[in-house]
């Protein structure tokens, strides 16, 4: 399956359905491959974020150790990185202050910038702010909400990250909505459409079950 068809197909489903499809592919239930805590969203939308991970790390609890010039350079490198060689980039940012995050990288300005760069959306364990002022065309799925940006700054790019128990590597296929996020290893991507079809058919069959039938299952 080509990338465009993969994105189109998986965008029709919510993230719990995607998790169920992975269970079908694996032939068993799993305790890995998805976020382990509740998340908040910038937009009240059920449309999922679907694409391939562009990763970074941030910190806000203390001032950066680098010079302002170095900080500006890494910010420019970040913008260049997230738009390079990927049609469907999803920005995934780990706040290394977690679980004591104090500064929001995601607010009115960064949402507008990332929307302008054609990023598909953001998943982070960090903070979100400027509610009510965020561009309606861009979704951020975050760990929590806070009022300040504190000393927030980028520390690493293109690196493995951990978002609420979900390990994500650069280039991983990611699917996220108001329920949280999950990833699908590349070796299983071709199996997704059939697995999703089986999940949907099984769900439909459940709607016809009577209580006595359920008790016998």
Regions found by a protein language model. Give the residues of each.
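A short alpha/beta connector and helix-capping loop motif
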Residues: 180-198
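Intrinsically disordered, low-complexity regions enriched in acidic/Ser/Thr/Pro/Gln residues
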Residues: 1-85
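Structural motif
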Residues: 29-31, 52-55, 89-92, 119-123, ...
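A contiguous pocket-lining binding segment that forms or flanks enzyme active sites
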Residues: 124-125, 130-176
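Extracellular/luminal Protease-associated
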Residues: 80-125
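Conserved small/polar residues in nucleotide/adenosyl-binding loops
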Residues: 207-213
């Amino acid at each position: 399956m080509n990338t465009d068809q993969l994105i189109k197909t998986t965008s029709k489903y919510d993230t719990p359905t995607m998790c169920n499809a992975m269970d079908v592919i694996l032939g068993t239930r799993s305790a890995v491959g998805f976020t382990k805590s509740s998340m908040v969203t910038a937009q009240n939308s059920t449309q999922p974020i679907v694409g391939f991970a562009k990763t970074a790390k941030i910190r806000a609890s203390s001032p950066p150790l680098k010079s302002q010039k170095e900080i500006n350079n890494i910010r420019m490198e970040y913008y260049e990185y997230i738009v390079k060689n990927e049609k469907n980039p999803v920005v995934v940012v780990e706040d290394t202050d977690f679980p004591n995050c104090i500064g929001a990288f995601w607010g009115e300005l960064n949402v507008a910038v990332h929307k302008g760069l054609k990023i598909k959306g953001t998943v982070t364990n960090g903070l979100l702010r400027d509610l009510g002022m965020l561009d309606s065309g861009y979704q951020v799925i975050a760990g929590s909400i806070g009022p300040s940006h504190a000393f927030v700054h980028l520390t690493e790019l293109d690196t493995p990250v951990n978002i609420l128990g979900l390990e994500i590597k650069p280039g991983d296929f990611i699917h996220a909505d108001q329920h949280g996020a999950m990833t699908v290893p590349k070796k299983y991507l071709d199996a997704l459409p059939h697995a999703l079809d089986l999940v949907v058919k099984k769900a439909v069959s459940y709607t016809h079950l009577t209580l006595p039938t359920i008790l016998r299952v």
